[in-house]
């Protein structure tokens, strides 16, 4: 139980990674990011497919026909003569044949009422949405990495503190047993030491379990079954962060969620264009050529060119209501975009304030640790001289551990708040740079 944290990590065979290397591994191996990449590629292909809209469409059609055709030919003034020869009026001809009809048809849209433009705009907006979602997924994965990576660091710090507290209370219990045998203290004081030591042992066991859980989380996130040993320590920047307004401005211009909502708004606008096109006529040029004229029907032309105009007079669906529905979708997207901007500004302000508060707590706890360490030393000396009770030593030992844990927690709170601030302002890819320039780290 008293083995050091570094020895424990080495025994597990875990791989040592600094934060930048861990981030690189995450971006390479995350299945969620692979899925978002595939979505972007899908939308890129879809947008590419719409670029050819408006070009001529050429169809080849081959028909195998088994047909029968009956023709009637009126004889007119020749009817009396024909009747003398037993010929009925009108003459009837019946033809039954099997024929092959190879036909090529070309169609060129000349005017679609905005359908093609709306379809292209919608495809581009879907691509923009996919790219925003891809970036958002990457940013959320980075934030999750910060929580897991530095969460394991916090668990290691807590384990080290619980180990030291347990060792200190072991020493105190040994002293109490000696003093009890020499009848310098009562059994009640020795029992106080025993109870405190047992509590510390349970806290240590819980810290071991917490560290194992944190390691499992980070190992799973980085697809490293052998485990990961973080080597970039918890840190706190001694100087204040940039102004809150700078982070807000960055968030409103670069946050992936706002980009996603802008893309949705563009899709809604494209939907309005498409619905309006259904109220307008369409004009197209066309041409058709028959490659086998010998077997063609009497009504089939050899070739045809022309212009067609098509306008739907009545529809089973209310076209005006469809346009209005599309407009309301635009309003919905616009309102959602404004609301998201407000919520992101609130989130940025909270994260900025949390980071500054954690930084202040961390710096103030420096002097608290020195005071707690000196108090513990004096209480131990006073106890040996019978100037302090067992409870005084226990309180001093626990107080020292509490302050150390609070300092590690303050560093973790700072790192997490900073990561949330950077994620909200679209800058979380700079997290490794912030860690590199920190000069206040947890050992």
Please report, for each region that a protein language model flagged, where it lies by residue.
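Acidic, low-complexity, intrinsically disordered peripheral segments
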Residues: 11-12, 66-68, 406-443
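N-terminal targeting signals for Sec/Tat export/insertion, comprising classic cleavable signal peptides
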Residues: 16-53
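Amphipathic alpha-helical coiled-coil segments
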Residues: 35-50, 137, 141-163, 171, ...
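Sec/Tat signal peptide C-region and signal peptidase I cleavage site
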Residues: 5-9
């Amino acid at each position: 139980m008293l083995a050091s944290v570094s020895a424990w990590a080495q025994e597990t065979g875990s791989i040592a990674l600094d934060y930048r290397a861990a981030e690189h591994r995450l971006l390479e191996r995350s299945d969620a990011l692979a899925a978002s990449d595939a979505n972007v590629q899908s939308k890129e292909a879809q947008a590419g497919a719409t670029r050819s809209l408006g070009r001529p469409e050429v169809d080849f059609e081959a028909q195998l026909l088994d047909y029968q055709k009956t023709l009637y030919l009126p004889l007119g003034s020749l009817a009396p003569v024909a009747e003398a020869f037993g010929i009925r009026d009108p003459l009837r001809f019946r033809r039954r044949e099997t024929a092959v009809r190879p036909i090529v048809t070309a169609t060129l849209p000349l005017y679609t009422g905005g359908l093609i433009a709306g379809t292209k705009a919608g495809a581009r907006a879907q691509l923009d949405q996919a790219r925003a979602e891809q970036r958002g997924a990457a940013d959320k994965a980075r934030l999750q990495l910060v929580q897991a990576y530095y969460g394991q660091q916090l668990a290691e710090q807590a384990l080290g503190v619980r180990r030291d507290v347990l060792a200190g209370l072991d020493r105190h219990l040994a002293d109490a047993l000696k003093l009890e045998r020499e009848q310098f203290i009562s059994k009640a004081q020795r029992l106080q030491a025993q109870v405190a030591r047992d509590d510390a042992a349970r806290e240590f066991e819980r810290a071991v379990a917490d560290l194992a859980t944190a390691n499992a989380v980070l190992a799973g996130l980085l697809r490293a079954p052998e485990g990961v040993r973080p080597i970039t320590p918890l840190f706190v920047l001694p100087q204040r962060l940039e102004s809150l307004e700078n982070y807000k401005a960055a968030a409103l211009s670069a946050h992936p969620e706002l980009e996603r909502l802008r893309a949705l708004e563009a899709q809604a606008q494209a939907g309005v264009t498409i619905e309006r096109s259904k109220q307008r006529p369409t004009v197209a040029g066309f041409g058709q050529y028959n490659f086998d004229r010998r077997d063609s029907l009497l009504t089939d032309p050899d070739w045809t060119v022309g212009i067609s105009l098509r306008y739907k007079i009545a529809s089973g669906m209310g076209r005006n209501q469809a346009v209005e529905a599309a407009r309301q979708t635009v309003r919905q997207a616009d309102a959602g975009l404004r609301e998201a901007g407000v919520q992101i500004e609130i989130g940025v302000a909270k994260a900025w304030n949390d980071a500054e508060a954690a930084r202040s707590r961390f710096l103030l706890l420096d002097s608290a640790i020195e005071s707690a360490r000196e108090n513990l030393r004096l209480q131990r000396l006073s106890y040996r001289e019978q100037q302090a009770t067992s409870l005084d030593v226990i309180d001093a030992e626990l107080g020292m551990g509490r302050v150390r844990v609070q300092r590690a927690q303050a560093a973790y709170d700072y790192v997490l708040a900073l990561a949330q601030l950077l994620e909200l302002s679209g800058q979380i890819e700079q997290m490794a740079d912030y860690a590199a320039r920190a000069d206040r780290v947890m050992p």
